[in-house]
């Protein structure tokens, strides 16, 4: 990004950049752009849901479909954008490596009867049993 270092107090993303951008590039860039004590917060799909998406990417399964370890780039759905995700240990290592302290990891669970933007009632039911989306809140130290 053509902006000076330490330009912002907050870097926030609701899916978007942290879903479709490589975290090995986006996390260091967020660290560069934040001032000391700046907030980095973003939401995206959980590593678990990435492991449980059907082979055709059309539905989420109640079983593991893909390996957890080694996940990074998901580009096997023709015609769809590339998505990125990492195992939890790798997220933590990446945040620490770039000077972040994790303040919170919120695993979103829709309440019973919630209005939702999930693609189907089956996805909503799945998200009531396992975390489908999460919110990270990290502080630059």
Residue positions per predicted region:
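Conserved class I S-adenosyl-L-methionine
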Residues: 39-72
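A short acidic, Gly/Pro-enriched loop at the edge of an enzyme's catalytic core
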Residues: 1-10
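Acceptor-substrate binding/catalytic loop of class I
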Residues: 44-52, 76-90
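Short alpha-helix
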Residues: 72, 81-105
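Class I S-adenosyl-L-methionine
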Residues: 76, 108-128
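A short glycine-rich, Lys/Arg-flanked "PGG" loop and its adjoining helix->strand segment in the class I
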Residues: 24-39
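A short SAM/SAH-binding and catalytic strip from SAM-dependent methyltransferases
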Residues: 9-24
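Core SAM-dependent methyltransferase catalytic element
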Residues: 98-101, 119-141
